Amino acid sequence: MTRRYWNINLEEMMEAGVHFGHGTRKWNPRMAPYISAKRKGIHITNLTRTARFLSEACDLVFDAASRGKQFLIVGTKNKAADSVASAAIRARCHYVNKKWLGGMSTNWSTTETRLHKFRDLRAEQKTGRFNRLPKRDAAMLKRQLSHLQTYLGGIKYMTGLPDIVIIVDQQEEYTALRECVTLGIPTICLIDTNCDPDLADISIPANDDAIASIRFILNKLVSAICEGRSSYIRNR
């Protein structure tokens, strides 16, 4: 895998608050190598190491995208949801930003069945079939469609398991991470000072609570994906 330059600026990371960790009482000792200081009861992440791992992650996703691989971005907490959706749409990735339904990847056949149902209902709505049904039946189908749109809207075009999964908050998305580990799907994970750096394939030490920090990391990753996709299209 070729190493590339991704213009990861330490000052910009500081402005985005990437370096702010959790309180010193709420930490995982395995994060010690990624912490540079304590300040007013808060752990400060070593941004040089953050930049190194973010650069590695960008190299990985660029390489994968240049070979036509598929990505899934997962981040369901309120602070991450909008950034996850906009980043995924920009890079033409799949995403989950409301709730990870248990077994979404490990029980893929069930997810696939739900996706087929979702697509069928969308098609029926577009053709106006709902309008020709009794009100009660139409209302029931609309509720089903709304529910499926909420939880599966970001993966509606997914036809198989993703090649790489990007996870915004390790603790919040622990179920998703464990499913990826079980299936051997490579993972890139933002990890705050209360996380375990050994669970993901590439762990990026960063503030996973601040919107600006989440957006900074995702922007770098999706820029690399977009470059990789352009390379893939040129070389086809």
From Swiss-Prot:
InterPro entries: Ribosomal_uS2, Ribosomal_uS2_bac/mit/plastid, Ribosomal_uS2_CS, Ribosomal_uS2_flav_dom_sf. This is Small ribosomal subunit protein uS2c. Keywords: Chloroplast, Plastid, Ribonucleoprotein, Ribosomal protein. Its main location: plastid. The gene is rps2. GO terms for molecular function: structural constituent of ribosome. Belongs to the universal ribosomal protein uS2 family. One of its GO terms (biological process) is translation.
